[in-house]
Every structure is written in structure tokens, then in C-alpha cells.
Curated annotation (Swiss-Prot):
EC main group: transferase
Protein name as catalogued: Acyl-[acyl-carrier-protein]--UDP-N-acetylglucosamine O-acyltransferase
Protein family (similarity comment): Belongs to the transferase hexapeptide repeat family. LpxA subfamily.
EC number in record: 2.3.1.129
Originating species: Helicobacter acinonychis (strain Sheeba)
GO MF, one example: acyl-[acyl-carrier-protein]-UDP-N-acetylglucosamine O-acyltransferase activity
Catalytic reaction list: a (3R)-hydroxyacyl-[ACP] + UDP-N-acetyl-alpha-D-glucosamine = a UDP-3-O-[(3R)-3-hydroxyacyl]-N-acetyl-alpha-D-glucosamine + holo-[ACP]
Subunit structure: Homotrimer.
CDD domains: LbH_UDP-GlcNAc_AT
Aminoacyl-tRNA synthetase keyword on record: no
PANTHER family: ACYL-[ACYL-CARRIER-PROTEIN]--UDP-N-ACETYLGLUCOSAMINE O-ACYLTRANSFERASE, ACYL-[ACYL-CARRIER-PROTEIN]--UDP-N-ACETYLGLUCOSAMINE O-ACYLTRANSFERASE, MITOCHONDRIAL-RELATED
InterPro entries cross-referenced by the UniProt entry: Acetyltransf_C, Acetyltransf_C_sf, Hexapep, Hexapep_transf_CS, Lipid_A_LpxA, Trimer_LpxA-like_sf
Major localization class: cytoplasm
Amino acid sequence: MSKIAKTAIISPKAEVGKGVEIGEFCVIGDGIKLDDGVKLHNNVTLQGHTFIGKNTEIFPFVVLGTQPQDLKYKGEYSELIVGEDNLIREFCMINPGTEGGIKKTIIGDKNLLMAYVHVAHDCVIGNHCILANGVTLAGHVEVGDYVNIGGLTAIHQFVRIAKGSMIAGKSALGKDVPPYCLAEGNRAFIKGLNRHRMRQLLESKDIDFIHALYKRLFRPVLSLRESAKLELEEHANNPIVEEICSFILASSRGVAYKSSEYSSEEKQED
């Protein structure tokens, strides 16, 4: 049975699932769909064409689905899709997509968005990610599964952050970060590998292989793209090489790599 506070304002066109809790002074617009078990604390605002997945919990003063902060937006239909089992903490803002992007913003499952996180239009966030307090994603950013982004970090539009990577706090990232890398700074560059996350997700032999692969990719005698192409040729049908090297070759903004910044030493790995 759903629990809805008397002071909540809910459009008759909104769809509310079973066991939903809606706290005091929430405002729920016409195009909202709340799946079973969603919990809204007090003073949450949901607008636009927004879907919230099962058992997601949204804390006070969160604003989801309001008009994108993009001057090119002219009121076209767009969506915000939030998956299951997410925690969205106080004062977060997530905007829907635009005509200039994929027309939707997507948040996957089991993510933690800490207080004051901003996710702009057309962003895609995977599963099991943690965005710490004050993280800002500009438009069209892509974040893979199991990514951690430290507090007060800003991500430039169209940047991609691949699976298992970590961006240190107070960073400003303007280029792509491949799988399992650790980046830091303003501007942020890859400092090493996120071996802590690798140990959680991978077998030891795969960790060692990835470590050796990045040492070869970052060799000084070839460009990063040349190294990636060479690795794909020499390790055809290897899924790890395919994942990492294809990501590098698909980069439009370039990879956040500088030889003077990267270290393969163990002290960088945790």
C-alpha cells in the first residue's frame, strides 16, 4: 500500500506504483511514472517525462526532469529514465535529454548520487556508480559501470569515463578515461590504474594482463591510437584488448593521457 502525504501535490496523470512513499510537500508532474517501492522524502520535485525505477530512494530537495539547461532546447519531447535501487541524495538535479543528443538522460541501477550532484541533459550513467558530493556532469557525458567520481569534480561535455575507472576529488576532466584507470587533477590526466576496483571485478591473471597492456599502450615510441591498433592486431578476439583498445580508438575528445603524468608503479594503484 502506498503512503502519500496530504501536502504532496500529485498530478492525476502521474502513474504511481505499489508501495510507493511520497513525503510532505513533494510536487509530481503530469508525465511522471513511479515504479513499485519508490520512496520520495519531503520536498522532492519531479517534472517532465520522468520514470523512476523500483526501490529508488530520493531525498529532500532533489529536482528531476525539469527543462534542460541548454539554450538550444525548444520544448521538444525528451525523457529522464532512472533505474532501480538508486540513492539520490539532497539537492541533486538531473535534467532530461535534448533533440541535439539522444533525447533522454539515463541513470542505471544501484547508483549513489551524493548531495548536490548535477547530471545535465543526455548523460548516460551505468550501474553501481558513486558520484560524490558536488560532482557536475555537463551534457552528453557517458559514465560506465562501477565508476567512482570524487567530490567537487567537473566533467566536460561529451567526455566518456569507462568501466571501473576512478576520478579523484576536485578534478576537472576534459578528455576520456579508458577502463580501470585512475585520473586526477585540473586538468585531469591518468595517473595509474584503479587496481582496487579491478580486484573487486577481475581475476588476478586479468589484472596482470591489463597492467601489462597499459604499459604497452603508453609506450613512448608510438601514439596512443597507433598502439591501440597494434594491440588489436596482435591480440585478435581477446575481449579485454577489444574493450580497452576499441574505447581508445572511438574517442572523439582524446584520452586523458600524458606520459609525464602516468606511473605504472604499485604506489599509484590503490
